[in-house]
Curated annotation (Swiss-Prot):
Its cofactor is Mg(2+). Its EC number is 5.4.2.10. It catalyses: alpha-D-glucosamine 1-phosphate = D-glucosamine 6-phosphate. Binds 1 Mg(2+) ion per subunit. The active site is at S102. One of its GO terms (cellular component) is cytosol. This is Phosphoglucosamine mutase. The modification Phosphoserine is found at S102. Catalyzes the conversion of glucosamine-6-phosphate to glucosamine-1-phosphate. Transmembrane segments: none annotated.
Amino acid sequence: MTRKYFGTDGIRGQANSFPMTPEVAMKVGMAVGHIFRRKGQTSRVVIGKDTRRSGYMLENALVAGFTAAGMDVFLLGPIPTPAVAMLCRSLRADIGVMISASHNPFYDNGIKLFGPDGFKLSDEIELKIEAMIDGDLTPYLASHGDVGRAKRVDGDIYRYIEFAKRTLPRNIDLNGLRIVVDCANGAGYKVAPAALWELGAEVITINNEPNGININEDCGSTHPIGLMKKVHEVRADVGIALDGDADRVLLVDENGTVIDGDQLMAVIAESWAASDRLEGGGIVATVMSNLGLERFLADRHLTLARTKVGDRYVVEHMREHGFNVGGEQSGHIVLSDYATTGDGLISALQILAVAQEQGKPISEICRKFDPVPQLLKNVRTSGGKPLENKRVKSAIDEATERLGVQGRLVIRPSGTEPLIRVMAEGDDRGLVEKVVNDIIDVISSEGSAAA
């Protein structure tokens, strides 16, 4: 069934443009409030947000919707997405909401929903919400005596800090480490520096002065250049880059080299397997993770289960098949022993624990495999279904045959833009570049011919 509002990670768009309008946000609150409200009992929702200016607008609209549906609202303020999921369980809320567009620019925003178990909602519930939004919500409103209340809560951010700290083994601290943290001017600007400092590290923080419009602006996990420079400048042991809602993380080693999610997952998988903590016989990642990671795991008799792009698909596979480690190359890492969604701070702490335990520098700990040459390019389309074109299909088949068993080809439409993403990888860098460019050329020429 075609979706009108929900994408792979909630509802997202430009603030004050459909669907990210106060009207839609209020209807979301009404619909979700009706679905999750417990009849005859006090029901509550926790709402967090990142640091975008439009967060205030959407927050108030959601409050209006949820209270109209008869739910009490706890407003958490700026707080990481994984903290909302964790507090949803800790505070025994019936629903959790995060207002964020993750790594997107400030002018975008989004609404992510978590059930009482801290996991994102199922497709079935999202489709039910969509149907209600487009219908008459009046019958679902609470009576005048059952309208909910809203209040801002202080101190719950410290619950999350303590929770994150407890994921570090009790016999390990961060004493002696100099850490630079890039908070992306986002939701982690308070919690990440505080947790690291309380664990004993010397913490140098950058991009921790959000003003409503500087979230993710040339900073954070999508722009680690500033962090690389700062690590070199202050001779830090490691740099930690979060994104706007702190659910993803990349590291920078003491030499200023960026360490992506694939390498981080390799470290955790190897460490947890050695201590018999790894479940499922391997890890879960997406089709975009490097072939080098798959080979690294195979050499250790561990599997790599691949899913579609999107951390929700990673989590679904983990839950269905009994894995406890999964993630994406981009730095979304899900450790289900601790969290129900990607958690940048907790993931970073697991890497630091390995480094401290082994007494080795981050560069040595995190270079687990040599990535196979990989190239990703996007080609803009004018609509239609270019991947069903005969010439395009033929070019894809030919490229797949040329790459053979030593390479991979992944072609997929973007979920948010009129783009086709073409990714190839293999041991022969020249061949990888050629097959990607050939496919891009065919898609472009066929698109022009169709127009």
